[in-house]
């Protein structure tokens, strides 16, 4: 056979070569979980499955995501598409780009295509001011729906989100341990549920770790590099010495803005991102970030949708996934001076003249 050998597949799946052979030849005597491990190993190694082992497509699922220029959304889309294919479903990925189709428009198109279900990521359900009538209509007609990254208590469907409160607690514990007492939060518009939860979590964590001796300043812009830069200029002007950003892209913008003011990251200002998308370990310096568990969230979303398609309501309600703080090179001990870091840097330079 071309490509991976039986030994390669067996090693990847953690089974014997004989077991791999039985699966490839569709022989009995292999449990369903073991068979799936072998099939997954085939896919991972790029081996072309024999025709009789290819998943049979039983339907179409719609996946509505924000713009894919944010790597974390692209990673979610890829993971969900792969998981759905293993369940026998093709995926119609609908991207909401500025000036393009709206979420409601996509949902109408998907319904006309008679999709088996819809997964919406960071959609209207994350916006506390948005009209939820389209979601209620989907529930009323019985079309399976899963909402990811955002929460609306009025929608009786499975909802899965990053645990923003846990994220802020981890970030605060790390920064307070480094001596930081005035923290800035750079996030998007306050009408979004994840933004509100991050701010609430940050303030609660500061009270818990510093017993009222800390200070929090929030800047609401947009979830982009430029938004992060604008927020950082605002926060640095108010004397923060550490910035927690609502996304990795915002963190990159914050670092750029700090450097434009002659500040060093992390010597003058510490910066933490959110999501820990793939390239953040290669930035200069490597970005400290709160890693979103893309695989787990995507798996939960697909499992919830499959359960809904089967009529199982056990997955209904909200479930939170705890992120992981990955400490790299953009956080360091706070400077002893309590001055505004930009003013402190200018004062130090003046003393050297």
What feature does the model see in each segment?
Residues 1-58, 335, 340, 344-353:
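N-terminal helix-turn-helix DNA-binding module of bacterial transcription factors
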Residues 2-4, 42-78, 87, 97-98, ...:
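N-terminal helix-turn-helix/winged-helix DNA-binding helices
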Residues 37, 71-86, 167-170, 193-212, ...:
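Short, solvent-exposed amphipathic alpha-helices that sit
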Residues 82-128:
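Central regulatory/effector-binding core of bacterial HTH transcription factors
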Residues 98, 121-170, 249, 275-287:
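Flexible loop/hinge segments that line or gate small-molecule binding clefts
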Residues 156-185, 225-234, 251, 292-310:
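Hydrophobic alpha-helical segments within soluble ligand-binding/sensing domains
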Residues 169-210, 218, 317-331:
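An alpha-beta-alpha
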Residues 213, 235-353:
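Flexible loop/turn connectors
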